[in-house]
Structure formats: C-alpha cells, structure tokens
C-alpha cells in the first residue's frame, strides 16, 4: 500500500489561534486546490507541535487551551479534513477537566477524512522549563489503524528517547508522525534522531518542525520524511515550506524479512536492567 504524506512547515503566531488556523487551512488549499474537490495529491498532512497556538507562549497556554474532541480548532480542522478528504495531524494545548480542574497537555490530534478525531497523543517527555511547569506528562503510546496505514505519534523531544518509537513499532506502527518545535542550534541532533528512530524500528517517520523566531527561540525547520532504513527521502529548508513524499508501506515487511531484522531478533529477556535504573 502506498500513502502520500505532506509536512507543512510554518511559523505560528504566538497565541493567535484564528490567524494560525487560517494559515493552516490556506496551506491545505495550496496542497489540494482552493475548491471543494477532494484532494488526490496527499493522504496525510502533518503540521508542527502546538501549531494552533505557537510554542513559546506558556503564559497563554491556559487561555488558548481547548477540550477534546469538541475544541474550536478541531471544528475548523475537521471541516478542512472533510473538505479535502485528507487525514490531518496537528498540535494544540489540550485542557482535560476529568480531574475536576483544568489539567493541560501538549497534545497532537489525528483527524480522518471525515473530520472525525481518530485519536490523540499527549507528549510524554516534556522539556524542562515552561513545558514541565505548564503541562502534565502523557503516559500512553497509542497506535491507530487507518485505511492509509498504522499510525503512531510522538512530539518533538520524545524522539530523543528510543523507547517511545520502539513501543509504537512493536504495536504495529508503520508511519510515526512527529510534530515538533525543535530549536537552533540543535539541527544536527534533529537530523540524527529522526533517522535513528526510522532505522531502529524499520518504519517511516514524518517529522514536521516550526520555523522562525518566537521570543528567545529560533526554529530551523528541516522537516523531513525518512524511509525505513533511516535514509531521508525529502527534507525542507529553513523557511515556510511544504514537502511531500509517497511511501510504500509494503516495503517495511520486505525489509524486516531481509537484512533489517531489528524487531525480530530482539533479545528482550536480557533488557530487564533498563527498568531497574
């Protein structure tokens, strides 16, 4: 099965959900055309971490947070997913009221072609500082079976921890989507970990980063789609840009049955020390 993926690398305006959602829809129009015809160019469109709000605005997180699945950004993006007949992944600040008080998460949402929320992922490995002060850590690593493939999600710094991608791969993920806000000067680290997570698990990685400067942080972009042998298929530059690639999911099983036996030849009974440290 072949799946066409687009990563939409943008600069988000801090705290301005209306402007950011307008930009996101305009990028979808650029990919698919500005009429109501169903999009034949891509199946899955990925936006960055906290695309709806911007990243470096922790003082506004509580104000711009939304409950799922009925949040205001979801309504806009669900309509876009339905209009263009595409799956969409994007980042937002989630407000969870299940504990009787607002708890915030750094969350990404997966919408299907009908605009239905297939699922969400809450960032587990928060960056020390405003993230750890504002958000609660996520604790689950879901994989979603869709008609365009089995999709797992990580957010930015999660990719620095190989355990996350390994769990997703063991659960069957074929595509791991990585919305991110990875800042300069750490672009070489970004390159290494996206390719490493692909190679480690023989999966496709679609990593979408921010660009531009917020307050103190500058984001370098370099969004990329990486093949299951850890080689970059396509990479963006340092400005707003859309990259696309068609990936062949059948290639994953072919590779895993050949040289790339990284999942089959694991020796998990010897890994217990990891859990005791």
Annotated model-derived regions:
Residues 1-7:
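Extreme N-terminal starter segment of soluble prokaryotic enzymes
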Residues 5, 110-118, 226-234:
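Short, glycine-anchored, charge-dense loop/turn motifs used at functional sites
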Residues 143-145, 210-277:
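C-terminal beta-strand edge segments of enzyme domains
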Residues 69-89, 150, 160-243:
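CN hydrolase (nitrilase-like) catalytic-core segments centered on the catalytic cysteine
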Residues 9-27:
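N-terminal phosphate-binding loop and adjacent alpha-helix
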Residues 17, 26-114, 120, 183-203:
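Cys-nucleophile CN-hydrolase/nitrilase-fold catalytic domain and related Cys-dependent amidase chemistry
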């Amino acid at each position: 099965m072949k799946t066409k993926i687009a990563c939409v690398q943008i600069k988000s305006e801090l705290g301005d959900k209306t402007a950011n959602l307008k930009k996101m829809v305009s990028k979808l129009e650029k990919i698919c055309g500005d009429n109501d015809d169903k999009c034949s160019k891509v199946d899955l469109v990925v936006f960055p971490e906290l695309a709806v709000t911007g990243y470096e605005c922790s003082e506004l997180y509580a104000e711009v947070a939304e409950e799922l699945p009925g949040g205001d950004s979801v309504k806009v993006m669900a309509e876009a997913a339905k209009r263009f007949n595409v799956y969409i992944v994007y980042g937002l600040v989630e407000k969870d009221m299940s504990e009787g008080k607002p708890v915030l998460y750094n969350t990404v949402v997966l919408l299907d072609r009908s605009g239905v929320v297939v699922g969400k992922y809450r960032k587990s490995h928060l960056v020390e500082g405003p993230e750890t002060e504002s958000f609660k850590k996520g604790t689950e690593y879901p994989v979603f079976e869709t008609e365009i493939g089995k999709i797992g999600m990580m957010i930015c710094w999660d990719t620095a921890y190989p355990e996350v991608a390994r769990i997703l791969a063991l659960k069957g993920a074929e595509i791991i989507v990585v919305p991110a806000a990875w800042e300069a000067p750490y672009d070489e680290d970004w390159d290494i970990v996206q390719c490493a997570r692909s190679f480690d698990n023989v999966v496709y990685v679609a990593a979408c980063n921010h660009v531009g400067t917020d307050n103190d942080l500058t984001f370098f972009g370099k969004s990329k789609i990486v093949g299951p042998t850890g080689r970059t298929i396509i990479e963006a530059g340092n400005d707003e840009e859309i990259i696309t690639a068609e990936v062949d999911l059948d290639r994953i099983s072919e590779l895993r049955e050949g040289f790339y036996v990284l999942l089959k030849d694991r020796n998990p009974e010897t890994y217990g020390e990891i859990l005791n440290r």
